[in-house]
């Protein structure tokens, strides 16, 4: 049975639903996946960024793997879920054909939500163990930043909402590579800038 997808995140360029919205022509919902709804142009750009990340992290130690891109299906369940997108919902419902989905693994909740959950935890041995496991896993973020650095990658949107944590698997991952750039491009733009603090 299909489930109405819920908005689990929203930013400037996209709206994220879990479970995934339906791809065009699909009759089956990806229950264990999430979808990022965005303009086809932005989705195409972001897919190119994933090629760079995948080359740097072939074993997918620091991100969830390359998503798949598909056109958005115009069905009532999608439309109902999209109407809950605050930033882009109305625009999508008018210009449906201009939007696509990136379908990806669900990496858990972002660190902002996780920290709010933790605030409500009781002071128990079990919860202390959970936090210890989280902090042991947090080294993955530092290792991932080193991989980015070694490969000349700048994420450009590093914040708690762009790191997700799957508590059941005790796994942290970077997400949202839409603003990613290369160190070479950033250095070139700084050199060509007339802003006195650029370099």
Residue map of PLM features:
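Conserved N-terminal boundary motif of the eukaryotic protein kinase catalytic domain
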Residues: 1-7
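ATP-binding glycine-rich loop module of kinase domains
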Residues: 10-83, 90
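Conserved structural core of kinase catalytic domains
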Residues: 60-133, 186
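Conserved hydrophobic alpha-helix
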Residues: 141-148
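Catalytic-loop of the protein kinase fold
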Residues: 148-166
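C-lobe/activation-segment region of protein kinase-like
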Residues: 170-199
């Amino acid at each position: 049975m299909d489930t109405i997808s819920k908005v689990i995140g929203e930013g400037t360029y996209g709206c994220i639903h879990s479970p995934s919205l339906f791809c065009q022509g699909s009759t089956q919902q990806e229950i264990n996946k999430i979808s990022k709804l965005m303009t086809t142009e932005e989705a195409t750009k972001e897919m190119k960024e994933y090629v760079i990340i995948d080359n740097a992290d072939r074993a997918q130690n620091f991100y969830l793997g390359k998503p798949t891109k598909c056109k958005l299906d115009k069905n009532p369940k999608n439309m109902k879920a999209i109407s809950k997108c605050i930033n882009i919902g109305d625009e999508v419902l008018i210009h449906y054909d201009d939007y696509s989905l990136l379908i990806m693994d669900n990496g858990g909740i972002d660190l902002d939500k996780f920290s709010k959950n933790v605030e409500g935890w009781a002071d128990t041995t079990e919860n202390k163990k959970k936090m210890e496991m989280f902090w042991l896993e947090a080294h993955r973020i530092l290792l991932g930043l080193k991989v980015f650095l070694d490969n000349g990658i700048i994420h450009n949107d590093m914040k708690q909402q762009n790191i997700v944590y799957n508590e059941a698997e005790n796994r942290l991952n970077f997400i949202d590579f839409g603003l990613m750039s290369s160190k070479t491009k950033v250095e070139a733009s700084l050199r060509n800038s007339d802003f006195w603090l650029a370099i």
